[in-house]
Design a protein with these regions (language model features):
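C-terminal structured domains
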Residues: 20, 24, 28, 32, ...
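Terminal low-complexity, intrinsically disordered regions
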Residues: 1-38
Length: 201
């Protein structure tokens, strides 16, 4: 709940007036929202934040992003700030924050909309057919860049997910899919190779 409604936290050197004890924080947030007639969302997947960026020249993935949305915006902010704080914390609980990246042709008018529609379709299928039925993870959001699309995931069982995602993505031979940890400097994992790729070798 705190990630949804608290933008930032600063450490104080001494107790301040009107400070709230951590065990009382949830009740305080809930009471404040009710008092202002606001709806309470305690499931992060119920609230998505949209964002827009100016694409940058950078060798790292995601710096070409123009727009995206996320139900875990602090993780996105950590990535661009070069921080692994949230990534490491999630990893400490056995969860793996990752994203799927797939390049697309962006040469003609309408290419961006076409791949964006495809990304939405793929996100829906991933959630309904892979992530939710067996509790493999959560869909966190996605983004579109100038030449690459991204789908953001939080995996609870990465090995089981990997077993299922490869045959799943073979339904889309027109794209090349890669998996990366949700942090800068990560290695890319090619999720599968087409027959054309193998013949080129």
């Amino acid at each position: 709940l705190s990630y949804q409604y608290i933008a930032s936290v600063e450490r104080a050197d001494a107790p301040l007036e009107n400070m709230i004890k951590l065990p009382e924080l949830r009740a305080y947030i809930t009471d404040t929202l009710k008092a202002h007639g606001k709806e309470i969302f305690d499931n992060p997947q119920q609230v998505y934040t949209s964002y827009r960026f100016e694409p940058q020249e950078n060798e790292e993935l995601r710096f070409d992003v123009m727009a995206g949305s996320s139900c875990f915006q602090p993780l996105v902010a950590n990535y661009y700030n070069g921080s692994t704080e949230l990534f490491d914390r999630l990893n400490g609980f056995g969860a793996q924050a990752v994203f799927i990246a797939f390049p697309y042709e962006n040469k003609e008018e309408g290419d961006g909309k076409k791949v964006l529609d495809f990304r939405y379709e793929l996100e829906d299928r991933l959630a309904a057919e892979l992530l939710e039925p067996e509790g493999l993870g959560l869909l966190l959001g996605g983004a579109i860049g100038t030449g690459t699309c991204y789908i953001d995931l939080l995996l609870f069982d990465e090995s089981a997910f990997m077993e299922k995602i490869v045959p799943f993505l073979k339904d889309y031979p027109q794209y090349h899919f890669y998996l990366s940890d949700f942090r800068q400097g990560s290695d890319l994992c090619r999720l599968y190779e087409t027959e054309d790729d193998e013949s080129e070798e």
